[in-house]
């Protein structure tokens, strides 16, 4: 991995909040790839048998439908099983919010910043395509990827919405999932551009947006 140079202002801020040496170590290691089985279309064991032809699979401890995946092939997204919607390429940490939300099959749920759809499709799977999900995003150009992923994964209980729900009053939901904009500092190893763009003003701006 390319050597990472941290800004002095970055180090001054985060050395107060965490073990900065451990943070730097993790930031220079590759992120383990992981997938979530889409149980709307296939069983966990059936997909596991199919993928073990090409890959080594290890269970993600906190999600029984998910696996860390490794092997010589890197083109997971080109597999026919992916095109058919049998699995979603999803980071292990991203699996946690829908599990914590713990949706019921009769819930009305708002996914407030849904695109590209990893958590929306996971919610639909947990709800067994029952209940109703409003999959919203504030940016029109992000809705295409959301629509494609919902179609690919066979999601039937979801309506796509283009709204700024921070300005809309009077709606009630059983549960709301909000993946709010963040600094992305936990994902530096995926994109060094995150570190290059980082500055204190950006942190303050994002913090104000999250509070809103």
Regions found by a protein language model. Give the residues of each.
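S-adenosylmethionine
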Residues: 1-212
């Amino acid at each position: 991995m390319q050597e990472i140079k941290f800004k002095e202002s970055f180090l001054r801020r985060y050395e107060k909040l965490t073990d900065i040496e451990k943070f730097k170590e993790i930031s220079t290691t590759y992120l383990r790839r992981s997938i979530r089985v889409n149980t709307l279309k296939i069983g966990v064991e059936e997909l596991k048998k199919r993928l073990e032809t090409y890959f080594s699979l290890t269970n993600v401890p906190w999600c029984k439908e998910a696996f860390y995946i490794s092997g010589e092939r890197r083109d997971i997204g080109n597999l026919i099983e992916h095109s058919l919607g049998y699995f979603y390429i999803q980071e292990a940490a991203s699996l946690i919010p829908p599990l914590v939300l713990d949706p019921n099959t009769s819930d009305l749920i708002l996914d407030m910043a849904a695109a590209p759809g990893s958590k929306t499709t996971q919610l639909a799977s947990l709800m067994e395509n029952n209940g109703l999900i409003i999959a919203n995003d504030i940016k029109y150009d992000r809705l295409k990827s959301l629509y494609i992923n919902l179609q690919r994964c066979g999601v039937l209980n979801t309506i796509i919405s283009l709204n700024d729900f921070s300005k809309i009053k009077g709606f009630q939901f059983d549960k709301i999932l909000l993946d709010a904009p963040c600094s992305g500092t936990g994902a530096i190893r995926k994109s060094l551009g995150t570190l290059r763009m980082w500055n204190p003003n950006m942190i303050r701006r994002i913090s104000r947006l999250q509070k809103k």
